[in-house]
């Protein structure tokens, strides 16, 4: 079976899905694998890493140093200090994605009961592929997938809409994202008076209350 893997990553978690050609995407019910907190914990004294909820659990138990908000930090900084060592954030994001992707593929294979081949992977997020391309290439370098592409949320929304029934194209569309400390609204309009049809996506951000990251032990 050939699959395309979707990987949406943000400040709080990475979320995986898959699709067969010509079929609707599937977000399987695989607790701890389909959606994983973007946190890593390095065990004290050894080069052993945990990710997601296990990372938080180990850090809370005093077994290691916690690195959280990995993806958003990586976009805006180069390094992070854990205990007495400094790490490249692209290296930590690469390690995190390698572990979580491998676990997801293994569980999907078990759930489907057959061998699968990953034909392509699409990574989406609040990113500008043109600006962040170098860092994005670094964080996927260890994934065993040849065809990897990057999309901003705006591009992802557009790609989804153009594959919907034509009758929906005449309406204004709004997508709401509430995964951070902001409510992000994507407002999509299509000008059918032009040829080709011109699509515009307006993004607005509304600040909400300061909410603590559920993986945080830093504050």
Write out the residue ranges for each language-model feature.
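Structural motif corresponding to the C-terminal cap of alpha-helices
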Residues: 78, 104-112, 144, 161-166
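Conserved phosphate-binding catalytic cores of ATP/NTP-utilizing and phosphoryl-transfer enzymes
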Residues: 1-2, 147-178
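Adenine-nucleotide phosphate-binding core of ATP-dependent small-molecule kinases
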Residues: 81-106, 218-219
């Amino acid at each position: 079976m050939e699959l395309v893997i979707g990987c949406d990553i943000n400040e709080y978690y990475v979320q995986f899905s898959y699709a067969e050609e010509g079929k609707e995407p599937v977000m399987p019910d695989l607790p701890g694998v389909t959606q994983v907190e973007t946190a890593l914990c390095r065990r004290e004294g050894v080069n052993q890493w945990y990710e997601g909820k296990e990372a938080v659990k180990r850090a809370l138990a005093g077994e290691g140093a916690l690195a959280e908000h990995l993806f958003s930090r990586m976009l805006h900084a180069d390094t992070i200090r854990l205990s007495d060592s400094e790490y490249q954030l692209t290296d930590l994001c690469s390690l995190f994605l390698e572990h979580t992707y491998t676990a997801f593929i293994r569980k999907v294979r078990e759930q489907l009961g057959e061998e699968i081949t990953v034909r392509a992977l699409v990574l989406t997020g609040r990113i500008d592929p043109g600006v962040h391309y170098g860092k994005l290439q670094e964080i996927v370098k260890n994934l065993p997938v040849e065809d990897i592409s990057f999309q901003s949320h705006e591009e992802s929304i557009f790609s989804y809409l153009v594959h919907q029934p034509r009758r929906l194209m005449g309406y204004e569309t709004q997508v709401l994202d509430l995964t951070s400390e902001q409510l992000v609204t994507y407002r999509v309009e299509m000008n059918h008076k032009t040829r080709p049809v011109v699509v515009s996506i307006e993004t607005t951000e509304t600040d909400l209350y300061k909410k603590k990251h559920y993986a945080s032990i830093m504050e």
